[in-house]
Amino acid sequence: MSEPIDQSEAERHRAKMAKRKAVQDAEVADKTIEKGLLMVHTGTGKGKSTAAFGLALRMLGRGHRIGVVQFIKGAWHTAERDALKKFGDQVVWHTMGEGFTWETQDRSRDVAAAERAWAKAQELIADPSFSLIILDELNIALRYEYLDLASVLEALTTRRPGLHVVVTGRNAKPDLLTAADLVTEMTLVKHHFSAGVKAQPGIEF
C-alpha cells in the first residue's frame, strides 16, 4: 500500500497539473485546421498494418466507410479481414497481391499485380463514399519500383481534401515521408520469432 500524500505534496501536484493542463489547452485551441491526412506506417517493427486496421475500426465506429487494398499479401488468410467484413458494405476489401516477392520470384508478375492493385486503389480514392483508404504494403511495391513513385505521390497529394489515406510497409520512400502529414516508424526492439516462436492465429494473422 502506498504512503499517504501530505497536504503540501498534494498542493504541489495540483499546481503542476493545473499548469500542464493550461499548456495542453492552449496547444489544442491553437489547432484549427481540419483536413484529410496522409499517414505512413513504416519501420522494421511489428504492427504497421495492425495499427492501420485499428484506425479503420475507429472510423467504422464513427459510421464512416473504409476501403482496403492489399498490395502484397495474397492467399494469406487474415482474421482482421474477417472481422472488418462483418461491417458489411461499410468495408470494401481488395487483396490484390500474390504474396511476398521471395515467394513469387517473378518480377513481371509482381509488377502486374501491383499495377492492378494501384488501379483499384485509384478507384477507391476517387469514390466520395469512402472516408479512409488503407494501402497495405504499398511501400514494398514502391521500394521494388513496381510502381512509379511520382505518379503515386501525385494521386495521393491531389486527392479530395477530406479523404484520409494510410500507407503501410517497410522502407517508405523519403519523398512519401515528406508528403505525409503523419509518419510513424515501428522500431523492432524484440521479436518472439527470433526465439523460435512461430506465427500464431490472432497474433500474426
What do the PLM-derived regions correspond to, one by one?
Residues 1-38:
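Extreme N-terminal, non-catalytic leader segments
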Residues 21-24, 115-119, 165-168:
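Short gly/ser/thr-rich secondary-structure transition/capping motifs
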Residues 32, 41-43, 59, 165, ...:
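Short glycine- and Lys/Arg-enriched binding-loop motifs that mark or flank ligand-binding interfaces
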Residues 34-35, 62, 129, 161:
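Residue-level preference for short coil/turn positions at secondary-structure junctions
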Residues 39-126:
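Conserved P-loop
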Residues 71, 137-138:
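Generic detector of well-ordered alpha-helical packing
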Residues 134:
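Glycine-rich phosphate-binding loops of nucleotide-dependent enzymes
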